[in-house]
């Protein structure tokens, strides 16, 4: 059984993935709950899919990804 933190992560990530324009507040909350590199990479995959699927991705979304990528790349 998943821990409450893991369940929280999955639920919030699902909301972000399902919403065409997820709120900055919701993404901030998820980022505050990131506990593992795997979670960070999963979250980045969702954000990158959103950017890829949007003809005009928001600057805020692009900035968010650029801020998180170095964390995923660091050992």
Regions found by a protein language model. Name each.
Residues 39-65:
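Short, charged early-sequence alpha-helical segments and their helix-coil boundaries
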Residues 20, 35-39, 52-55, 70-73:
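Short alpha-helix boundary/capping elements
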Residues 29, 33, 47-51, 64-68, ...:
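Short, surface-exposed, charged/polar-biased interaction segments
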Residues 2-34, 56, 63:
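N-terminal acidic leader/helix
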Residues 1-6, 69-75:
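Short acidic DE-rich linear segments
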């Amino acid at each position: 059984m998943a821990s409450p933190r893991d369940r929280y992560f999955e639920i919030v990530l699902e909301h972000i993935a399902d919403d065409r324009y997820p709120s900055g507040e919701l993404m901030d909350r998820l980022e505050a709950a990131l506990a593992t590199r795997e979670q960070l990479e999963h979250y980045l995959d969702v954000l990158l899919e959103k950017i890829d699927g949007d003809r005009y991705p928001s600057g805020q979304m692009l900035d968010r990804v650029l801020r998180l990528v170095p964390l995923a790349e660091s050992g």
